[in-house]
């Protein structure tokens, strides 16, 4: 069984980006800039934002965090986004979700300039993904695809099953897996709460992707011998973080598997950095 170490892979990507930023900054005359907006006091969101800030600092990206009160209004939030859209030193804007009740997250995401939408959630970027056109890809599924490529695990011509259909992971991941390319080109099935026999569908997968937010839900008897299992789930339990699969059991039948934590999570942040650097290069004409 091969452990797909997202933490180590993400560290390698940060090293590559650090070298690229150092080489290009003299021509750009500034470092890449990322604005992170956090509204409210959700503990998990605060941890995620700190991790992103740390990764930016480690890579050479200037990270500017805007920590707003939970009483922030829709108008105030959209005004901040509008200001960041026109700031020349900001290459990417990330709105940390979820937002407090009363705020319309979709409206806020649509207010972000698509050219600075490094999270890849603007309808324009999602539409470009669906059409196979260049654009920012959502960070978690793009990080998953990068992890497969770095480990030379190609789903091309194979059966891929995605469990979960969220706009953040399931839908875009299915589109990426089914797109042309050496590390894509899979035959994709998307499963969800309406799937009659989920276990049977999972057992057909050469590549199984889990993104349902249910701790240890997928067990070894639901996984084909030799399958590659990518667990996107991050669930807080009484005993700590757990993925969507029973790692101990599934790792005995899988040929490769991501751990939780240390699998997809670090790759999500790495992809955010990649997107930010890409925006910086375009905006600076590099």
From Swiss-Prot:
Keywords: Amino-acid biosynthesis, Histidine biosynthesis, Hydrolase, Methionine biosynthesis, Multifunctional enzyme, NADP, One-carbon metabolism, Oxidoreductase, Purine biosynthesis. NADP(+) binds at residues 164-166, 193, 234. Its EC number is 1.5.1.5, 3.5.4.9. Pfam families: THF_DHG_CYH (PF00763), THF_DHG_CYH_C (PF02882). GO terms for biological process: L-histidine biosynthetic process; methionine biosynthetic process; purine nucleotide biosynthetic process; tetrahydrofolate interconversion. GO terms for cellular component: cytosol. Pathway: One-carbon metabolism; tetrahydrofolate interconversion. One of its GO terms (molecular function) is methenyltetrahydrofolate cyclohydrolase activity. It catalyses: (6R)-5,10-methylene-5,6,7,8-tetrahydrofolate + NADP(+) = (6R)-5,10-methenyltetrahydrofolate + NADPH; (6R)-5,10-methenyltetrahydrofolate + H2O = (6R)-10-formyltetrahydrofolate + H(+). Homodimer. Catalyzes the oxidation of 5,10-methylenetetrahydrofolate to 5,10-methenyltetrahydrofolate and then the hydrolysis of 5,10-methenyltetrahydrofolate to 10-formyltetrahydrofolate. Belongs to the tetrahydrofolate dehydrogenase/cyclohydrolase family. This is Bifunctional protein FolD. It comes from Nitratidesulfovibrio vulgaris (strain ATCC 29579 / DSM 644 / CCUG 34227 / NCIMB 8303 / VKM B-1760 / Hildenborough). The gene is folD.
């Amino acid at each position: 069984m091969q452990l797909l170490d997202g933490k180590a892979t993400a560290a390698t990507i940060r090293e590559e980006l650090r070298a690229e930023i150092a080489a290009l900054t003299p021509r750009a005359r500034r470092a890449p800039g990322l604005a992170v907006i956090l509204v409210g006091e959700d503990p998990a969101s605060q941890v995620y934002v700190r991790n992103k800030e740390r990764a930016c600092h480690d890579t050479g990206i200037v990270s500017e965090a805007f920590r707003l009160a939970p009483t922030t209004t829709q108008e105030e939030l959209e005004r901040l986004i509008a200001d960041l859209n026109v700031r020349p030193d900001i290459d990417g804007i990330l709105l940390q979700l979820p937002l407090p009740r009363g705020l319309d997250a979709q409206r806020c995401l649509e207010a972000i300039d698509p050219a600075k939408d490094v999270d890849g959630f603007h309808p324009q970027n999602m539409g470009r993904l669906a059409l196979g056109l260049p654009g920012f890809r959502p960070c978690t599924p793009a990080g998953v695809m990068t992890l497969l490529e770095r480990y030379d695990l190609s789903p091309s011509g194979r059966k891929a099953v995605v469990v979960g259909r969220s706009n953040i992971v399931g839908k875009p991941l299915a589109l990426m897996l089914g797109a042309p390319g050496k590390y894509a080109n899979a035959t994709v099935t998307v499963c969800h709460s309406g799937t009659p026999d989920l276990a049977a569908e999972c057992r057909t997968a050469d590549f199984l992707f889990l993104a349902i937010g249910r701790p240890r839900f997928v067990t070894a008897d639901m996984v084909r011998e030799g399958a590659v299992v990518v667990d996107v789930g991050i669930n807080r339990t009484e005993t700590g973080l757990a993925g969507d699969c029973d790692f101990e059991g599934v790792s005995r039948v899988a040929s490769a598997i991501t751990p939780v934590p240390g699998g997809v999570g670090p790759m999500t942040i790495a992809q955010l950095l990649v997107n930010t650097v890409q925006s910086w290069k375009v905006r600076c004409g590099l």
